[in-house]
Amino acid sequence: MMVLQVSAAPRTVALTALLMVLLTSVVQGRATPENYLFQGRQECYAFNGTQRFLERYIYNREEFARFDSDVGEFRAVTELGRPAAEYWNSQKDILEEKRAVPDRMCRHNYELGGPMTLQRRVQPRVNVSPSKKGPLQHHNLLVCHVTDFYPGSIQVRWFLNGQEETAGVVSTNLIRNGDWTFQILVMLEMTPQQGDVYTCQVEHTSLDSPVTVEWKAQSDSARSKTLTGAGGFVLGLIICGVGIFMHRRSKKVQRGSA
């Protein structure tokens, strides 16, 4: 659903409303305040291809009358707005103008703003990490940080060794990044055991399929062995590459001397 708000109202209608409110106050014996605030606010709602237009009239922060395109006429919200609503409903030209607004203004603005709002999709970035470093079999908090996504509707779930975890899951509210994207933190209380695999799964309208990020529980020694093995493998590739390069270069030198 998209909502457009315009803090303005047609001058003639707004002026009529203001005069009627002030006159009604006088008739009811209430003193007109020295300072007062009158507002006319227009709102467009787009939902499933339909358009709805609301025009609200507010006096000193209290809405007293409105036009609703779903109703097709003005309605008094408080007794103060009854004279204005009755008068406007008696004016066919005003009613025709208001009834045309959904197609004339709302639909036009929706077509302009839709691609930047309702149709906009930005894929989330997902990162998983423990809140603190600690040994296995000790209580900890695993954090799934999901950020830079739009729109805000998102589903984040935790799995342990393929089974969904619902107990011990804590989530922040949706956080606005200030650039039309959002972020959220979804945390899982855990006591990791050697070999446990924790998975954060994210579902969002921008994704064709869920995104999953794993975190594997390892002891410091196992992690050190893994890093050492990975380092050795990379070093082996480098040495192998240098050897092949030197071998080819040696052959070229031999051919040149021959």
From Swiss-Prot:
Membrane topology: Single-pass type I membrane protein
Source species, domain of life: Eukaryota
Result for mutant: residue 223 to Q: In allele DPB1*01:01
Chain spans, region Beta-1: 30-121
PROSITE patterns given in the database record: IG_LIKE, IG_MHC
Described function: Binds peptides derived from antigens that access the endocytic route of antigen presenting cells (APC) and presents them on the cell surface for recognition by the CD4 T-cells. The peptide binding cleft accommodates peptides of 10-30 residues. The peptides presented by MHC class II molecules are generated mostly by degradation of proteins that access the endocytic route, where they are processed by lysosomal proteases and other hydrolases.
Protein name, UniProt field: HLA class II histocompatibility antigen, DP beta 1 chain
Organism, scientific name: Homo sapiens (Human)
